[in-house]
């Protein structure tokens, strides 16, 4: 019985430590939102967000970020 308890506690400790190494680091650049005051131009210049969604342009991404707690970054220019 003692061996089983020690084994389970060891496995639990190992899993809790290993959980930190599996977190994915999201990389990208922050959208330039200084021009996004009144509205966005209707120019299709797509950007791919770190959330996997294609936004029509960087300005649209800025307006979406205003609704969020955690901002979406630009993963790359062009569609996802």
From Swiss-Prot:
GO terms for molecular function: peptidase inhibitor activity; serine-type endopeptidase inhibitor activity. SUPFAM superfamilies: Kazal-type serine protease inhibitors (SSF100895). Residues 1-23 form the signal peptide. Gene3D superfamilies: 3.30.60.30. Disulfide bonds join 33-62, 40-59, 48-80. Changing residue 66 to G: No effect on trypsin inhibitor activity or sperm binding. Disruption phenotype: Lethal with no survival past two weeks of age. Animals are small and show severe, progressive degeneration of pancreatic tissue associated with autophagic cell death. Pfam families: Kazal_1. Changing residue 44 to V: Severely impairs sperm binding. No effect on trypsin inhibitor activity. The keyword Signal applies. The record marks 44-45 as: Necessary for sperm binding. GO terms for biological process: negative regulation of calcium ion import; negative regulation of nitric oxide mediated signal transduction; nitric oxide mediated signal transduction; regulation of acrosome reaction; regulation of store-operated calcium entry; sperm capacitation. CDD domains: KAZAL_PSTI. The record marks 42-43 as: Reactive bond for trypsin. It comes from the Eukaryota. Keywords: Disulfide bond, Protease inhibitor, Secreted, Serine protease inhibitor, Signal. It is found in: Secreted. Residues 27-80 form the Kazal-like domain. In the genital tract, expressed only in male accessory glands including seminal vesicle, coagulating gland and prostate. One of its GO terms (cellular component) is extracellular space. Induction: By androgens in adult male sex accessory glands. Expressed constitutively in pancreas. Serine protease inhibitor which exhibits anti-trypsin activity. In the pancreas, protects against trypsin-catalyzed premature activation of zymogens. This is Serine protease inhibitor Kazal-type 1. It comes from Mus musculus. The lineage of its organism: Eukaryota, Metazoa, Chordata, Craniata, Vertebrata. The gene is Spink1.
